[in-house]
Every structure is written in C-alpha cells, then in structure tokens.
UniProtKB/Swiss-Prot annotation:
A GO cellular component annotation in the UniProt record: proton-transporting ATP synthase complex
Catalytic reaction list: ATP + H2O + 4 H(+)(in) = ADP + phosphate + 5 H(+)(out)
HAMAP family in alphabetical order: ATP_synth_beta_bact
GO molecular function, one term: ATP hydrolysis activity
Annotated binding of ATP, by residue: 153-160
UniProt entry tagged with the keyword ATP-binding: yes
EC class (word): translocase
Cited InterPro entries: AAA+_ATPase, ATP-synt_VA_C, ATP_synth_F1_bsu, ATPase_a/bsu_AS, ATPase_alpha/beta_chains, ATPase_F1/V1/A1_a/bsu_N, ATPase_F1/V1/A1_a/bsu_N_sf, ATPase_F1/V1/A1_a/bsu_nucl-bd
Any Pfam family hit: ATP-synt_ab_N
Annotated organism of origin: Pediococcus pentosaceus (strain ATCC 25745 / CCUG 21536 / LMG 10740 / 183-1w)
Protein name as annotated: ATP synthase subunit beta
Function: Produces ATP from ADP in the presence of a proton gradient across the membrane. The catalytic sites are hosted primarily by the beta subunits.
Summary of subunit composition and partner proteins: F-type ATPases have 2 components, CF(1) - the catalytic core - and CF(0) - the membrane proton channel. CF(1) has five subunits: alpha(3), beta(3), gamma(1), delta(1), epsilon(1). CF(0) has three main subunits: a(1), b(2) and c(9-12). The alpha and beta chains form an alternating ring which encloses part of the gamma chain. CF(1) is attached to CF(0) by a central stalk formed by the gamma and epsilon chains, while a peripheral stalk is formed by the delta and b chains.
C-alpha cells in the first residue's frame, strides 16, 4: 500500500502528500496516520488536489497532529464489524467497541461502509405492512416492511420509550434484529438509552452505533453509514428483518454541511452543501427490502425552527413512507404513546395495501376525531348541553377512541407495574369497529385507557363496576 506524509492540518481537514511514483488512494479510502504518541488516527479521502496531494477528513480529534507524520493507505474504505457478535455492543464510527466490554477479535468479519444499493433484480417490491403491535400506528399510520418512517417529537414526549417498544416487539414477535444509530445527539441521552435498554431486556437483540455531538463532523457524517452497514449484513447474509433507528437524521445533513464548508465547496440554499440531495439519496436508497430480508428505518427528524420548507427536512420527506408525530398535549392527558392520530400519515393506508375493512375503519376513526376537534371550541365555551344528540354521540365515541389509542408498553412495565400489550392488527380493527358501531357506548370511558384489545376494555369495565358496587 502507498505511504505518504501529512503536509497540512486545518481543524479536521488533513492534506496528505504521496510520492508521484506511487498509486494515489481513491476517494473514500481510509488512511491511517501514526501520531507521535503511537496512537493511530483514521481519516477518509474526500478530494484529490493534484501533484500527489489528497484532502482528507479526520474521524477523530486532530490534537497532536503535525506535518511530516507517516500516513498509510489501507486500500479500502472504513470497515466495521458485522454479524451476531455486534449484538448487545456499542460501537463508534470506525467499529471500535466503546462500551468497556471485551474487544472483538481480529477474526470477526468486517464490511466496508461505502456500498452500492441493492440491484433492481434483488429488490422485493411487495408493500407488506410491518405489524408493530402498537394500535395507533398499526391502524392509522402503518409501517411498510423495508420502508422509511419519520419520527417527530420534542423532548420528553416519549420518543425513546416508543423506540424501545418497537425494538422489543420486533425482537419478541418477529424474532428480528435492531440497530440503533445515534447521529450527532447528546452523549448523555445515548448513555441513558443504553442502560434503559439493558434494564428492559432488549439490548441482546440490538447493536448500537454512536457518533455524538462532541465528535468531529467526519464521524457524525459517516456514523449513519456504519449503522446501516451492520443492518445490511443482517438483511443480506442472515436473512433477517431489521429495524434501523437513526437519531437524528438532521444531524447527518448538518455534519455534511460542515464538511462541505471545510472542503471549500460553494454553499447551496440556506448554507447547506450543494450535494445535499445526493448524500441523502446514497444513504436512503440502501434502506430497502430485498428478496433475502428487509431494513425498516425509523428516523427521528429535527425540524429547524419548525420550518418544514428548510432544505434538510424537505429533502428527508421525499424519502419517507410514513410519519409518526408525537404530541405534548396528549401526554398531559395521560395518553401514551402520545401519537397524534390526525397528524401522523402513511402511504400504506390504502385499501389495496391494508384491505378495505382496515381502510374504512381507519378513515372513520380519523373523521370522528376530526369532528370532535371541531366541536371542542363549542364545548369549552358553551358546554356539552348546547350540542345535538348526534354531536354528543360523536364526542362520547371520540373520547373512547382517543383513550383506546393508548396502551401499556412492555418496556415501561418496570416503571408502571402494568404488563405491556402487543395487539394484533385484526384485533385492533375489530375493536375500533365495535366502538364506531356503538357496541361499547355503555362502558365507562376510563375502561378504555391504557389497555390492549377490546376484550381488556370489557374486563376493566367489569372491575370498575365491581369496585363502584
């Protein structure tokens, strides 16, 4: 392999000169720079400047670097560990373990993080719904196997618990694998998530990859590809259905913007990199279903200043199949998960995909909730007495629907003391159909809160009436 020398260091940007009689490293190749203290820094080739000089982006801090240090071309892009050995472990962008556990041996299989998306003839074009066991998602904003879902929510509205429950349900009911990728978020949150997942028993079916906000932009830009590479191995080699969580996809774009500016590229709209759509496409196109398995991605999306026309979220939206919106007002009413049933959307909510009955029940539920929303102003000003009998019925059923959209989570059982519920799609549909038809109008509203199927509602109603007697 070629060896060169460091000729310039500007922050995370390192220029390396190779002898003209040696082969230049290609774009995306990983270079190893041996520091004076014996440690090795990895950087990635991003530009060829000519005269044997390449410009690289460091994957770690450049403290202690100096001109003249030896640089070795690895001959390939960054390679990270893949396979069952990655489950239950935490990695950085380079695939090094950072959880303080046993180091992975040299024999473990490693894959390059830069790869092409699956060929057209390998894709599985079927639009199969992925059952999550969470009523509000399965009914109103169903996930497609191999699809991409955007998860919107502020701090403290239950994003982490929802992510944990999805990981738990995929592991328990589908025997699936999850890969969690923390991109440019707080180290404290990553640490909390690790210990919460350890406590709730889902860590052994999960691989975690972190490139948090204290990392250089190169690491934050590439860590999503590291997580995706681990997920692709489970899909293509193990034939698994994989859940890939990316928190936060905006930070991936943000890191790309920083790198672009450091490389001297002319910025595009709002200061973003001119290659924004290309970089996003290269990541998103690898997230798909093949004939061997699937990678279903759930991506937390930060929207700068709540501006949905900002190029970063707007570019992300073009790739999403479904959105799950978490609403703070619902947590204040004690409705968990706090998924907004009217704001959450899915391309899978189509009679040709989910079936006529599912589609009709879902649209009728949305219609009733929308009507209730419109009547709330009248109720708050004039009271229930001013409503017609038909409107009173709509309000009563809407409240039952709203409460029935909540349910207990298995991963929260250690805090609530209540067992979690996994609800099959057919049970979800029949339950809401019964509420819409008025079969359960005589049951108390409180019986619908934080339960699983409609049978649990009936049981809870019996207990409530028994205590009242």
């Amino acid at each position: 392999m070629s060896t060169g020398k460091v000729v310039q260091v500007i922050g995370p940007v390192i220029d390396v000169e190779f002898p003209l009689d040696e082969e230049l490293p290609t774009i995306n190749n990983a270079l190893k720079i041996k520091k004076a203290d014996g440690t090795v820094l990895v950087s990635e080739v991003t530009l060829e400047l000519g005269d044997g000089v390449v410009r690289t982006i460091a994957m770690d801090g450049t403290d202690g670097l100096q001109r003249g240090l030896d640089v070795e071309d690895t001959g390939d892009s960054i390679k990270v560990p893949v396979g069952k050995e990655t489950l239950g472990r935490v990695f950085n962008v380079l695939g090094d373990t950072i959880d303080g556990g046993k180091e992975l041996g040299p024999d473990i299989k490693r894959d390059p993080i830069h790869r092409d998306p699956p060929d057209y003839d390998e894709l599985n074009p079927s639009t199969e719904v992925l059952e999550t066991g969470i009523k509000v998602i399965d009914l109103l904003a169903p996930y497609i196997r191999g699809g991409k879902i955007g998860l919107f929510g502020g701090a403290g509205v239950g994003k982490t618990v929802l992510i944990q429950e999805l990981i738990h349900n995929i592991a328990q009911e589908h025997n699936g694998i999850s890969v969690f990728t923390g991109v440019g978020e707080r180290t404290r949150e990553g640490n909390d998530l690790y210990f919460e997942m350890k406590g709730s028993g889902v860590l052994e079916r999960t691989a975690m990859v972190y490139g948090q906000m204290n990392e250089p932009p190169g690491a934050r830009m590439r860590v999503a590809l590291t997580g995706l590479t681990i997920a692709e191995h489970f899909r293509d080699v193990e034939g698994q259905d994989v859940l890939l969580f990316i928190d936060n996809i905006f930070r991936f774009t943000q890191a790309g913007s920083e790198v672009s500016a450091l490389l001297g590229r002319i910025p595009s709209a709002v200061g973003y990199q001119p290659t924004l759509a290309t970089e996003m496409g290269q990541l998103q196109e690898r997230i798909t279903s093949t004939k061997k398995g699937s990678v279903t991605s759930i991506q937390a999306v930060y929207v700068p200043a709540d501006d949905y026309t900002d190029p970063a979220p707007a570019t992300t939206f073009a790739h999403l199949d479904a959105t799950t919106n978490l609403e703070r007002a619902l947590t204040q009413q004690g409705i968990y998960p706090a998924v907004d049933p009217l704001a959450s959307t899915s391309t899978a909510l189509d009679p040709q995909i989910v079936g006529e009955e599912h589609y009709e029940v879902a649209t009728e539920v949305q219609h009733v909730l929308q009507r209730y929303k419109e009547l709330q102003d009248i109720i708050s000003i004039l009271g229930m007495d001013e409503l017609s009998d038909e409107e009173k019925t709509v309000v009563a059923r809407a409240r039952r629907i709203q409460l029935f959209l909540s349910q207990d989570f298995s991963v929260a059982a250690q805090f609530t003391g209540l067992p979690g519920h996994y609800v099959k799609i057919e049970d979800t549909i029949s339950g809401f159909k019964g509420i819409l038809d008025g079969k359960y109008d005589d049951l108390p509203e409180e019986a619908f809160r934080l339960v699983g199927s409609i049978d649990d509602v009936v049981e809870k109603a019996k207990k409530i009436s028994a205590t009242e007697d």
